[in-house]
Design a protein with these regions (language model features):
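Non-catalytic connector elements of ABC transporters
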Residues: 19-22, 30-118
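Internal alpha/beta loop-helix hairpins
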Residues: 1-32
């Protein structure tokens, strides 16, 4: 589970897990000091507070899970795994947030940055 919990690089983060980890520039989440931020689809949740404004592009309802491919303003495409009781349709708008403690930070060479919190 260490590869999953603490991927050593962007390369490893990109293929361990299904759906794969979302990778984006740190500036997309207000952290220009972090070259790349990784967020696992299951570490994203719907919120009514502060968060990303998104639009669902493709929704897969799988029973216990709902996989949504969303477009995040100023970030790009992101895949999220939500509880199955959350019903979405293509085109729905929702606000999402990611737990900063669950984010993964990578340096300019793609290596894991230890001791970083968002």
């Amino acid at each position: 589970m260490d590869l999953y919990d603490k991927p050593a690089s962007v390369f490893v983060a990109g293929f361990i897990g299904s759906p794969k980890m979302n990778l984006m520039p740190g500036k997309a989440i207000g952290r220009p000091d972090i070259p790349t931020v990784g967020i696992r689809p299951e570490d994203v949740e719907v919120t009514e507070g502060d968060g990303w404004e998104t639009k669902a592009r493709v929704v897969e309802t799988l029973g216990s899970d709902t996989i949504a491919h969303v477009r995040v303003e100023d970030v790009g495409e992101m895949t999220v795994r939500l509880p199955g009781h959350i019903r979405l349709s293509d085109g729905d708008r929702l606000k999402l947030r990611a737990d900063p403690a669950r984010q993964h930070h990578f340096d300019a060479d793609g290596r894991r940055m230890e001791g970083q919190t968002a």
